[in-house]
Amino acid sequence: SMRALKYLLDTKELGDPVLATIEMRAIPHWQEFLKQYDKLEIFGMGIHHVDSFRFLFGDPAEITCVCRTDPRSKFPHVDGITQYTFKYENDFMATSLDDVWAWPEDPCEKDIYIRWRVEGTEGMAEGTIGWPMYPDRCPSTIRFTSKRHPAWVAPQWDTVWFPDAFEGTMSGLLRAVEQGTEPEISARDNVRTIACVEACYRSIREKRTVALKELLLPTD
């Protein structure tokens, strides 16, 4: 759904973006190596949302992040439940709420999801990210409405992140290695995603809004 959304943004179907949100109510499986660090959610899960914001909208000017610990994660950590907002030079905002608590456990019913929404001057789009249903096969979704196409348009597909990413993003990386070319999403660009993640942690630690340029070298 992120690639479909990127197409809508690039073709100006939604006009100029005004606000983007991601709302995650899902419980990740924390890999053992993450338990060795005090940094948890943004490095282990939120980084995917940070990367999505950068893929869709580019680098933010400023980042503000707040967090609390996750009651379910019994090991020491700083960030369990997080909320971070990216502010751009043109006043656009993108914000994500990453709620990894999400469920008070049995016997309560579950309501697990990841929803996203982008509002623009000419239209809006919304959808879901399907991975929380894994191992059940649950494709991500998108639908949009715009001044050019007022009725909801909702394309569908049956592919999911795993294993179908091996035919998409991952195959692009493998082709680049084989051909000696720059991949569509490069490691050089990913360094800037890490800078955004570190800006989130600096915002938490220093309790302030952090300019991304504080984390980048002048040549970056």
Protein language model features and the residues they cover:
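Contiguous beta-strand/loop segments that form the cofactor/metal-binding neighborhood of enzyme cores
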Residues: 44, 48-134, 167-179, 217-220
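Short, mixed charged/polar active-site loops
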Residues: 91-93, 124, 152-157, 182, ...
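Short, hydrophobic secondary-structure boundary micro-motifs
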Residues: 17, 63-65, 128, 184-186, ...
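Active-site rim elements
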Residues: 38-40, 157-160, 179-183, 187
